Amino acid sequence: MERKKPELLSPAGDWEKLKMAVAYGADAVYLAGTAFGMRSFAGNFTDEELPRAVKHAHDRGVKVHVTVNTMPRSGEVEQLPAHLERLNDAGVDALIVADLGAFTLAGKYAPRCQRHISTQQSIANYASAAAWYDLGATRVVLARELSLDEIRTIRAKTPKELEIETFCHGAMCVSYSGRCLLSNYMTGRDANRGQCAQPCRYQYALMEEKRPGEYFPVFEDEKGTYIMNSRDMCTIDHVAELIDAGVDCLKIEGRAKSGYYAAIVTGAYRHVLDDIAAGRPIDPVWRDEVEHVSHRHYSTGFFYGQPGQYYDNARYIRDWQICAVVTDCDENGLATVSL
């Protein structure tokens, strides 16, 4: 069976991650400027760096998508036109937008950029997807909470010109597509403005209000239980099913993660996509490869029903470390290695 090859979209939180994602086979990367992106702590790109980042990617045949997907307050809206114009002038291929006002302004001030609707919009049905298409969106990033059957329905009931993007790998959120106020309440950091402190990963214990210091025996380890702790998503064994469901773009989460993560995960999915497109058996080495990056226990997300939660602890699995980076290789195969 001949299958289309969807776009592989990889995270590029800073220069190192951008170069790694491009070198390891991304078709497109997504990144942010210094404002209006949902990962304030990813490093991101200054106004001076963005055009160079776009050129680096374009020179290697890779597209650049920029996130403008926070929910801006009225006091920030006046800053948007100049920001959007800079992105337009830098040659950015697409803007990932969540707010309707920002979406409208993007059409006016960044006319050369396609407009993609962020997962922050929690698009979970075909009516919503079609409505955004009618407004001018060329792609929707579906909510992470959808099953494969629901994705098939959205694909079947929306214009074929509307592209469908879904996450295939990375962290998941305890709240609906990231719409959460726990971080605001507990730390004063706004999750909907790129500053999530991830309190859902904190260690919690239950205590009855009239019995201070007396804890209910719900502990999974000596520090407490992790009642809101979700697993990470990994679909590397199910890429063909995502393609068959009508997905046009597979997105890897992780702009705040390491360059090593960007390289390994991008490379693994790149090989799997190429094997599927060529009709080759998929080498199981690529499933092993994604185990080598720092991650929580894996699941397939909501694609096959309700995912499990991992209550034991919130720690990452970090069994492997990067020991060196090959920075160059000559025609004789002699490599330059940075330790």
Where are these regions (language model features)?
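Glycine-rich, positively charged N-terminal anion/phosphate-binding segment
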Residues: R39-H58
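Surface-exposed amphipathic alpha-helical tracts and adjacent flexible/coil segments at the periphery
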Residues: M1-A12, K17-A23, A28-A35, R60-T70, ...
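Short gly/ser-rich anion-binding loops that grip negatively charged ligand groups
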Residues: S40-G43, N69-V77, V92-I96
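Short, cationic motifs built from Arg/Lys/His that form the positively charged side of catalytic pockets
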Residues: V54-K55, G107, R155
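Well-ordered mid-protein domain cores that form the structural environment of catalytic cofactors
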Residues: E78-S118, I123-A124, A130
